[in-house]
Amino acid sequence: MDKTIAIVTGASGGLGREFVKLLSKEKKLSEIWVVARNVQKLQQLAEEFGTKIRPIAKDLSDNVQRKELSAMIAEERAAIQYLINNAGYAKFCSYDDLSVEESINMINLNISAVVALGLYCIPYMKPGSHIINIASQASFQPLPYQNIY
């Protein structure tokens, strides 16, 4: 494991982008894998932050695409210094306006992807590596129209 990487999900905007900005200054990192659905925004990150950036377009609510990312991690066999699980979303609406598919997708991204990526990455993490899971205050402050979130 000569290569050291960071993986940032939900990297195309907001907090994810800010994590990429900070990590791009880390001299010990060989690559920063930026994972999100929007290919154009991922390419913009590569243009803005340089050659360390490896854009990976995946929808992590999809189990097949999560497994594809797992295969990439296994194939690379790099030391993972940081896993930043930042991807997530919520649809704010009345519960009866939320489809079963939308509910399952939200659960898959906000919960299943976080658990899966942690399990995929741990075998490649050394002592001193970090997993950062970005979550919501919604569990402490429930709000109307955020039933699944």
Regions found by a protein language model. Name each.
Residues 136:
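Residue(s) in the substrate-gating loop at a strand-loop-helix junction
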Residues 94-95, 102-107:
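Substrate-binding pocket helix/loop in short-chain dehydrogenase/reductase
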Residues 118-119:
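A short, exposed helix-loop element centered on a Lys and neighboring polar residues
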Residues 12-13:
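Conserved glycine-rich cofactor-binding loop
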Residues 86-91:
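Conserved NAD(P)H cofactor-binding loop of Rossmann-fold oxidoreductase domains
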Residues 49-64:
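Rossmann-fold cofactor-recognition segment
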